């Protein structure tokens, strides 16, 4: 599969396209509709939806409500997509397809940074999350919130200084995450 630089970007971009989906929809309902600043009034027979909006408003949701399920699945799906892309790209000989080892390291650090993002969001929504380092890890128990926080911190402290620097505002970029300092 890895026969050109474009094929590495196809794998690198998958966790980022998942992120684009992830940042909207169900997360909005959990973080905005559950506050006093938003409301979702019932209009006729079509807005009740089995009481899911009511449960959000009154903070009586259950683990089976779609917003919770989709958020958990989206969070863990983002983590798994990033870990899978990382495993795939770590096995690629970048020099053989015309890319440098520095580009490879940058790609891996971008994936570590987005993995940290998904763990950070999971920590916000659910507290401690099971921590995985590889797609080959077996099922893991839930880690504590502190362990999850430390995992996020480690990923970011290692990734951010090693990311390629942002060269100019608004210019075309190679990759998805740049160090903007």
Give the positions of each predicted feature.
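General structural signal for secondary-structure boundaries
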Residues: 1-5, 100, 144, 173-180
